[in-house]
């Protein structure tokens, strides 16, 4: 900038000295004023000199333009040619997708069309949700992000609608790699009003079937078994016609607590093995073992032989066909009555990845195999969960086969409800 200003001053000084001479002695003079620039880069000669039109600067092609040029032409869409089968590379490209910020993208498996569900919207769904909020109750339907929430809460009829209440709070003391429920070593204390509030809500809804489940509470001496049993008693008092299924934890292997819940007046005792034995250490919390789950189901049936026992397995975790056969044989050996199969769906990217999206026809195949092995009922499908349409399944299938048997009959010392009430209160049964 200073150099350019100096040149201007020199030129103007020369012009002043020449203008002082007589006009007859002055030669023709053309004054050129130099323009100074803030940067040191000189202007493009092709721009400053219009005569130099042969040299032009081309703009670099954009990535978007390249993709358009490399893509299909308009004729490809209107040619009317019959679609040809995709080659393996093209099929894989449609099955997967890259997600994440630039430079850190990860390949994920796309969700198949058969796993996509509509947004929940029904009057029964809204009413149940509002009542839950008013009574400070939790459901595993919401906490575990179940895709069937509108289907189950709506139901094909009011009496067949199913709700799954999650007792003892929304924070679990265990951390299974497939589950989206919150975890903590010190969850909040139990709500003493929860059994009464749960019974009150269910009596309002007029449901025909309810599933009670809970988080694991290893911080409690009894694992929450007495709280569970008290809730069942309250429900049966306020709504004696409602069918109750209890989906319990393993109570750290304490079979006395299993017997306490089994004698509480419930209709179905459920405990999930979740996966095959070989994958259990990688899927569930290390405190939950496959053999311990079998002992829980066996103890429930031994406590009350007429009780219906139930379990559930997730597919798509990497299990083999031979491992599934072994699992079903182990379940039938301890007289489990009902089994369900469903697709594992990753709740968040922090949870274990899906190994495989199992096709619907494979689920149908395992349903047929389970029924042939002697299970009373099997619900099997990509969107099936442990309590998926449990009311309809139980009412339409299992109860018909068990009709004529008094499920709630008294046995042993005193009636079932009397014994459980004493145990819940901490009294000895005589």
Swiss-Prot record:
Annotated GO CC locations: mitochondrion
Free-text comment on the cofactor: Binds 2 [4Fe-4S] clusters per subunit. One cluster is coordinated with 3 cysteines and an exchangeable S-adenosyl-L-methionine.
Transmembrane segments: none
Keyword Nucleus in record: no
Residues given in the record as [4Fe-4S] cluster 2 binding sites: 172, 176, 179
Keywords: 4Fe-4S, Iron, Iron-sulfur, Metal-binding, Mitochondrion, S-adenosyl-L-methionine, Transferase, Transit peptide
Enzyme Commission number: 2.8.1.8
Domain Radical SAM core residue range list: 155-376
Bias (Low complexity) ranges: 40-56
Transit peptide: 1-37
Cellular location(s): Mitochondrion
Principal location listed in the UniProt entry: mitochondrion
PANTHER family linked: LIPOYL SYNTHASE, LIPOYL SYNTHASE, MITOCHONDRIAL
Similarity remark: Belongs to the radical SAM superfamily. Lipoyl synthase family.
Record protein name field: Lipoyl synthase, mitochondrial
Organism: Ajellomyces dermatitidis (strain ER-3 / ATCC MYA-2586) (Blastomyces dermatitidis)
């Amino acid at each position: 900038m200073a150099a350019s200003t100096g040149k201007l001053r020199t030129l103007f000084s020369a012009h002043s000295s020449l203008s002082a001479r007589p006009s007859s002695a002055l030669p023709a003079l053309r004054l050129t004023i130099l323009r100074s620039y803030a940067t040191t880069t000189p202007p493009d000669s092709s721009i400053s000199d219009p005569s130099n039109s042969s040299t032009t600067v081309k703009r670099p092609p954009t990535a978007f333009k390249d993709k358009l040029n490399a893509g299909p032409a308009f004729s490809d869409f209107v040619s009317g040619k019959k679609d040809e089968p995709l080659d393996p590379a093209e099929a894989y490209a449609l099955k997967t997708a890259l997600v994440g910020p630039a430079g850190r993208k990860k390949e994920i498996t796309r969700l198949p069309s058969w796993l996509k569900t509509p947004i929940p919207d029904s009057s029964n769904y809204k009413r149940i949700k509002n009542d839950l909020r008013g009574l400070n109750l939790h459901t595993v339907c919401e906490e575990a992000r179940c895709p069937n929430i509108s289907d189950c809460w709506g139901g094909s009829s009011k009496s067949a609608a199913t709700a799954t209440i999650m007792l003892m709070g929304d924070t679990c003391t265990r951390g299974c790699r497939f589950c989206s429920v919150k975890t903590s070593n010190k969850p909040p204390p139990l709500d003493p009003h929860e059994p009464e509030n749960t019974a009150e809500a269910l009596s309002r809804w007029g449901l025909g079937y309810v599933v009670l489940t809970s988080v694991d509470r290893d911080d409690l001496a009894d694992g929450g078994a007495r709280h569970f049993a008290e809730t069942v008693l309250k429900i049966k008092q306020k709504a004696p016609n409602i069918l109750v299924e209890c989906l319990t934890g393993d109570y750290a292997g304490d079979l006395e607590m299993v017997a306490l819940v089994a004698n509480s007046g419930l209709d179905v005792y459920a405990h999930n093995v979740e996966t095959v034995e070989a994958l259990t250490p990688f899927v569930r919390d290390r405190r939950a073992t496959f053999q311990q789950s079998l002992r829980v189901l066996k103890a429930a049936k031994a406590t009350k032989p007429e009780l219906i026992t139930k379990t559930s397995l997730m597919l798509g975790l990497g299990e083999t066909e031979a491992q599934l056969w072994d699992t079903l044989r182990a379940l039938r050996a301890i007289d489990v009555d009902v089994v369900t199969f469903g697709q594992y769906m990753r709740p968040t990217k922090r949870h274990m990845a899906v190994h495989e999206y199992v096709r619907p026809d494979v689920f149908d195949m395992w349903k047929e195999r389970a029924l042939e092995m002697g299970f009373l009922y099997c619900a099997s499908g990509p969107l099936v969960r442990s309590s998926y349409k449990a009311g309809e399944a139980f009412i339409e299938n299992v109860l018909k086969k068990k009709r004529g048997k008094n499920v709630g009959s008294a046995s042993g010392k005193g009636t079932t409800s009397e014994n459980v009430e004493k145990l819940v209160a901490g009294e000895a049964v005589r």
